[in-house]
């Protein structure tokens, strides 16, 4: 059983961790920061003169420009 655990840990470290190091653009994305960079605001509801473009951190909040 210990061998299986060791094998799983080695397999995980070889595949997942090296892939994240090789391709950092596929890592996590801060949607709130991306919304602010596009001059938007994270709100629960966009007003009539604003355009909703994406979701922010929570699925209920929208990025309104």
Swiss-Prot record:
The keyword Secreted applies. Keywords: Antibiotic, Antimicrobial, Defensin, Disulfide bond, Secreted, Signal. InterPro entries: Beta_defensin_dom (IPR025933). Disulfide bonds join 35-63, 42-56, 46-64. Its main location: secreted. GO terms for cellular component: extracellular space. It holds the Pfam family Defensin_beta_2. This is Beta-defensin 17. It comes from Rattus norvegicus (Rat).
């Amino acid at each position: 059983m210990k061998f299986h655990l060791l094998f799983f840990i080695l397999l995980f470290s070889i595949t997942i961790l090296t892939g994240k190091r090789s391709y950092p653009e596929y890592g996590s994305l801060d949607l709130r920061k991306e919304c602010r960079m596009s001059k938007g605001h994270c709100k629960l509801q966009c007003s009539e003169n604003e355009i909703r473009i994406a979701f922010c951190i929570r699925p209920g909040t929208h990025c309104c420009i």
